[in-house]
């Protein structure tokens, strides 16, 4: 253990309380000194000079209130040019989420507390319980005081929770009454989701489809099988420089352009600012190839691209091995911390969905075929545009 008394400050460090904030909320930075034994030494805010790169805003002590949105860096300077740097973000609020969106109170006079988090357009969340405006749809059933709901009568109502232009709802049922239906929560559009149309503008255009091959045991009409595959294939090959088939594909005729097909093993493509990684995860890390994790980290580092797209057969939350899912997400988080734009495109099931969490965009592309051998009428593909000014994408129903 280090028991030496604190000495002179030899260097400084900086830590962030709220690295990811949203408009109207502050980020708190703490600057501290370190002596030669790494003892931590208090430094007052007035003794530190702050420079912010990439953002305007105002300071109050160690708290910074951004006046815009985006990513930025804070450079703290103390004494004889000792400096430390911290990165932070301030992105628009995309949606609100209640910790418990459906609650029950047994008796009149009972209470429950409502807790709300706000998530920005990059999927980072922070608590806003004390900032939310609460509105009870039917005050005869209950009232709000702060974030506490008190039941006044048997029945069911919902509480509207509003902040930063977004709303979410909490249904409250008292005394075992029939539950009422609350409106759907609001949400802001993903700023990266835009119309993608191939042009001769120097950008790289990439299309991704889900699984086109039928792998079930049902009976499939041959004419329907060929027609549906050809239809999706034509859409995937249109308006792109490269097509990625994100699942088993039994079309043997050559594509009209460059292509990459998922085959259950590791594959990597480095092309014009984008790193595309094909992974197999459905059998778990012990039954597939665990070396693929080491391989893609090396390949991505060597490529040095700002856009990283993973194409896999399962979304990480559905991995057979929870440890593998956690390990994968830790790697994804590292890329986000480095400022990369990261997509995880899973190809499974019969539904399209998309969500953003902790800076990673998770998108699922449904299979072309249902388990019984009938064609899925809810088929989507993804279109990407990757250029020096960033990446945009568009989900397209085929």
Task: Say what each PLM segment does.
Residues 212-215, 248-252, 274-276, 281-286, ...:
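Solvent-exposed loop/turn segments at secondary-structure junctions
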């Amino acid at each position: 253990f280090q028991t030496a008394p604190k000495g002179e400050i030899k260097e400084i460090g900086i830590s962030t309380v709220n690295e990811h904030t949203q408009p109207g909320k502050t980020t708190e930075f703490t600057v501290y000194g370190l002596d030669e034994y790494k003892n931590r030494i208090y430094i007052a805010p007035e003794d530190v000079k702050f420079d912010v790169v990439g953002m305007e805003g105002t300071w109050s002590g160690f708290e910074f209130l951004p006046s815009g949105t985006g990513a930025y860096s804070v450079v703290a300077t103390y004494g004889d040019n000792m400096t430390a740097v911290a990165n932070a973000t301030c992105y628009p609020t995309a949606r609100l989420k209640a910790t418990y969106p459906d609650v029950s109170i047994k008796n009149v006079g009972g209470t429950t507390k409502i807790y709300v988090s706000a998530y920005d357009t990059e999927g980072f969340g922070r608590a806003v319980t004390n900032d939310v405006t609460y509105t009870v749809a039917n005050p005869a059933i209950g009232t709000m005081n702060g974030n506490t709901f008190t039941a006044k009568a048997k029945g069911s109502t919902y509480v509207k929770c509003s902040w930063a232009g977004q709303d979410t709802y909490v249904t409250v049922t008292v005394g075992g009454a029939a539950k009422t239906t609350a409106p759907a929560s609001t949400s802001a559009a993903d700023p990266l989701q835009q119309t993608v149309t191939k042009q001769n503008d120097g950008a790289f255009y990439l299309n991704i489809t889900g699984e086109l091959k039928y792998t079930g045991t049902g009976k499939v009409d041959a004419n329907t099988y060929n027609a549906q595959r050809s239809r999706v294939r034509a859409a995937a090959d249109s308006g792109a420089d490269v097509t990625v088939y994100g699942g088993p594909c039994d079309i043997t005729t050559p594509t009209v352009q460059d292509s990459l097909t998922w085959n259950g093993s590791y594959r990597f493509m480095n092309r014009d600012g984008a790193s595309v990684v094909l992974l197999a995860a459905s059998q778990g890390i012990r039954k597939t190839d665990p070396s693929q994790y080491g391989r893609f980290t090396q390949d991505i580092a060597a490529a040095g691209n700002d856009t990283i797209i993973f194409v896999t057969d399962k979304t990480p939350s559905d991995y057979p091995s929870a440890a593998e899912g956690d390990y994968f997400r830790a790697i994804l988080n590292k890329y986000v911390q480095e400022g990369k734009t990261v997509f995880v495109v899973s190809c499974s099931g019969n539904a399209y969905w998309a969500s953003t969490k902790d800076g990673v965009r998770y998108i699922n592309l449904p299979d072309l075929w249902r388990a019984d051998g009938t064609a899925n009428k809810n088929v989507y593909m993804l279109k990407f545009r990757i250029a020096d000014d960033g990446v945009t994408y568009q989900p397209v129903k085929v």
